[in-house]
Amino acid sequence: MGEVPREVFLPPERERQAYNDQALPLTQGQTISQPFMVAIMTEALALEPSHRVLEIGTGSGYQTAVLAELAGQVYSLERIQALASRAEMTLRELAYPNIHIQVGDGSLGWPEEAPFDSILVTAGAPHVPESLKAQLREDGGRLVIPVGDRWVQDLVRVVRRGNEFGSENLLACRFVPLLGEEGWDTPEAP
């Protein structure tokens, strides 16, 4: 994380707060995760330089850059075109050759590029999407995802062994909702 300048991923009016350990607002109701949470989620993936990682929720691109420092290839899905474009521009300026960004429904993953060694979801889901589980590498693929209701979730790590999926709760957390076919229907609570 020390290699990635968090301030360049923030709106200019938030740059002074870049190294505060807190989530900060971006645009369109989205946030950049607090550094502590970025560290916990990244560590839970147990990344290696040869790994192929799928990130759901590009957002500002900060977490994407952290993943790219540790993994061989990073594929990142963002549902909001404006965020994807801004993140792509920032990451290009920082010269990351191993990042691929696409706009789409993150709850469905990126099946054309599967399988992945690790999948990181940066939005809270009502359950673990089956599409994402299916895209994990069969021999130890890891998925880290916030699961719960719209107000509080548990950060869950799922590990795949063949057709079996073990899971463990890591800690309580709160994320913006994962919207999509296998996520929430609307950004607001019912």
Label every PLM stretch briefly:
Residues G2-L54, T58, Y62-L70, L83-H100, ...:
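Class I SAM-dependent transferase core
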Residues A46-G166:
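Conserved nucleotide-cofactor-binding alpha/beta core module
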